[in-house]
From Swiss-Prot:
Subcellular location, record wording: Cell membrane
Disulfide bonds: C40-C83, C50-C67, C68-C110, C81-C120
Membrane topology classification: Lipid-anchor; GPI-anchor
Organism: Arabidopsis thaliana (Mouse-ear cress)
Protein name: Non-specific lipid transfer protein GPI-anchored 12
Positions bearing carbohydrate: N46
Function summary: Probable lipid transfer protein.
Length: 176
């Protein structure tokens, strides 16, 4: 039987293999990741004080005072929803177009340790591209092909991670 330490090492090894892939970010739409944006609706509502800071065109120098405690609560209760925030999950539901740089810097500004956008991508959650970047793309066939290949890599890493997580769960349950 595998020990807990062996399983942890295998998980870390697998994560490092998948994180070596660098797929381009998907379009800034609310695509479903492993956890549907509907599951994060309450968490998104709870960080609504952050929206005025992270929206495209915001002139605010810092987030509202209530934003940082709300973000810390989201990270503690449902960190996958932070990935949803990076992925634009707030955009269609609340009419907020997110500025990628501001969304990614929010945890640093608030002093909250949150999942990084690159980790969210590895785990299969969409992340948004920089504001306006889709308008400035050349639209060449080569770049479209690269985007599709990157999306496939992320998809398969996400599926493999989910399978590995289930394997770990069953192993831990059988050890009990």
């Amino acid at each position: 039987m595998l020990t807990t330490n062996t399983l942890a090492v295998l998980l870390l090894l697998f994560l490092s293999l998948c994180s070596g892939q660098s797929p381009p970010a998907p379009e800034p739409i609310a695509a479903d990741g492993p956890s549907s944006p509907v599951n994060c609706l309450v968490s998104m509502l709870n960080v609504s004080d952050c929206f005025s800071y992270v929206q495209v065109g915001s002139n605010e120098i810092k987030p509202e005072a209530a934003c940082c405690p709300e973000l810390a609560g989201m990270v503690q209760s449902s960190p996958e929803c932070v990935c949803n925030l990076y992925g634009g999950g707030a955009s269609p539901r609340f009419g907020v177009k997110l500025d990628k740089q501001r969304a990614e810097q929010l945890s640093t500004i608030c002093g909250v340790k949150a999942p990084s956008p690159s980790l969210c991508s590895v785990l299969g959650f969409p992340t948004i591209s920089p504001a306006g970047s889709e308008d400035s793309s050349s639209g060449s066939e080569g770049s479209d092909k690269d985007k599709k290949n990157g999306a496939m890599t992320t998809k398969y890493c996400g599926v493999a991670l989910n399978s590995l997580a289930l394997l770990l769960l069953f192993t831990f349950l059988s050890l009990s």
